[in-house]
């Protein structure tokens, strides 16, 4: 604070506007600044400008994909955040940053500009992503949220199950149902 006040007072005494240095650095990146305070010994303040951090990448520059405990089509309950306690079905997952999109939950308002002349802009509601750690698998039959476990069945299949209820989440019939739903949605989108 004191350093900023000193800088502003020096600008006024030099009759320079603060816009004179727009786009230029006043100090090198890691800056050390001596601040003198009355009655105390001078202290050293080290400032570091934080750079934009990239996501972890593989050697071929593709992002690292995280393992997720949920899949598309799972019924989940939101356990933290603004939508806490609500139940929905996962419509999309993003493995690069461990987020999920749940149908009709976490709706955000987006203002869309007009693309052509004479066309009006729109205000639309879109489903925003929720971090996967903020959702829990949900059993519709017993109406309880549970952590997920993995086990190998007698026929050699590795499946996910709900720890509280023992209910198996991954079944071949359920997977076919999800695939058929996805195909019908793409067919409707192409027809429109």
From Swiss-Prot:
Record's GO cellular component terms: chloroplast; mitochondrion; ribonucleoprotein complex; ribosome
Gene: RPL24
Keywords: Chloroplast, Plastid, Ribonucleoprotein, Ribosomal protein, RNA-binding, rRNA-binding, Transit peptide
Family listed: Belongs to the universal ribosomal protein uL24 family.
Classification via InterPro entries: KOW, Rib_uL2_dom2, Ribosomal_uL24, Ribosomal_uL24_CS, Ribosomal_uL24_KOW, Translation_prot_SH3-like_sf
Keyword Plastid included in the entry's annotation: yes
Cell compartment(s), UniProt: Plastid, Chloroplast
Transit peptide: 1-47
SMART domains attached to this UniProt entry: KOW (SM00739)
One GO term (biological process): translation
Principal location: plastid
Function (record text): Component of the chloroplast ribosome (chloro-ribosome), a dedicated translation machinery responsible for the synthesis of chloroplast genome-encoded proteins, including proteins of the transcription and translation machinery and components of the photosynthetic apparatus.
Protein name per its UniProtKB record: Large ribosomal subunit protein uL24c
CDD domains per the UniProt record, alphabetical: KOW_RPL26
Keyword rRNA-binding: yes
Family annotation (SUPFAM superfamilies): Translation proteins SH3-like domain
GO terms for MF: rRNA binding; structural constituent of ribosome
Subunit record text: Component of the chloroplast large ribosomal subunit (LSU). Mature 70S chloroplast ribosomes of higher plants consist of a small (30S) and a large (50S) subunit. The 30S small subunit contains 1 molecule of ribosomal RNA (16S rRNA) and 24 different proteins. The 50S large subunit contains 3 rRNA molecules (23S, 5S and 4.5S rRNA) and 33 different proteins.
């Amino acid at each position: 604070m004191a350093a900023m006040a000193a800088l502003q007072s020096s600008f006024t005494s030099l009759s320079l506007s603060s816009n004179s240095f727009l786009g230029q650095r006043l100090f090198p990146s890691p800056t050390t600044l001596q601040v003198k305070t009355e009655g105390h010994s001078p202290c050293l303040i080290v400032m570091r400008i934080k750079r934009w951090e990239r996501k972890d990448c593989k050697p071929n520059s593709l992002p690292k994909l995280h393992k997720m405990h949920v899949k598309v089509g799972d019924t989940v309950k939101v356990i933290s955040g603004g939508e806490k306690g609500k139940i929905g079905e996962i419509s999309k997952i993003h493995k690069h940053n461990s987020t999920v999109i749940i149908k009709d939950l976490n709706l955000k308002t987006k203002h869309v500009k007009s693309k052509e002349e004479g066309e009006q802009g729109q205000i639309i509601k879109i489903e925003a992503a929720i971090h996967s750690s903020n959702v829990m698998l949900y059993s519709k039959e017993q109406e309880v949220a549970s952590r997920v476990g993995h086990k190998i069945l007698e026929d050699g299949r590795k499946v996910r199950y709900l720890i509280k209820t023992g209910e198996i989440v991954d079944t071949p019939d359920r997977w076919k149902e999800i695939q058929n739903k996805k195909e019908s949605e793409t067919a409707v989108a192409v027809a429109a």
